[in-house]
Amino acid sequence: AQHSDVLVEETDVLAKLRKVRLQVGGGDWFSFCPDKGRDEKWRMSALLTADKGHDHHRACDCGVVICHGTQLTVLYVDLKSSNPVGYAGQFKSTRQFVRYALGLSEEFHGSPLRLERGQYVVLYGGAKPLPIPKRPTVRKFGTAGKTQTDKAFKREVPNDARVYLRELLG
């Protein structure tokens, strides 16, 4: 049986927002944690320059790849404790890794998979629970539209929040 949740965890012990669950449901998808794939020096690859000004050794906290036939949608998620800034390099680096993996798949296996869309999401907060409305109502969050690495969809969430994937895909 396929899992229906993706656990997104922040590895920094000082972070206020430590984990969020994405409720994905069934379907043709998988998730990966690019932070855990880097070496002991936190590099994506020893072949890449590690000088100041290079963002390619950064990684977001989670990627979810959703397959629709031969078209792929990738949701890139990063958790931030407070002010949601400084995430573009993390998204760019992880996006480049996905492109590299697809290139290898095409080169060595003739795979017809194509990256149709990337969606960039920053979930931030974690310090305290969101306020409860005084009257019973369904909380309305903004919906995610088209995003870019430097213009991600942002949503404040408490620790251990459950967020539906479809809300983040727009």
Q: Model-flagged regions — what are they?
A:
Residues 16, 20-68:
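Active-site metal-binding core of divalent-cation-utilizing nuclease and nuclease-like domains
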Residues 1-22:
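N-terminal "first-domain core" detector
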Residues 109-170:
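Domain-level recognition of nuclease-like catalytic cores that cleave nucleotide substrates
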Residues 65-73, 124-128:
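Short, flexible beta-strand-to-coil junctions
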Residues 81-130:
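Catalytic cores of nucleic-acid endonucleases
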Residues 50, 54, 78-86:
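Short coil/turn segments at secondary-structure boundaries
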Residues 62-64, 73-81:
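Conserved catalytic cores of phosphodiester-cleaving nucleases, focusing on short active-site segments
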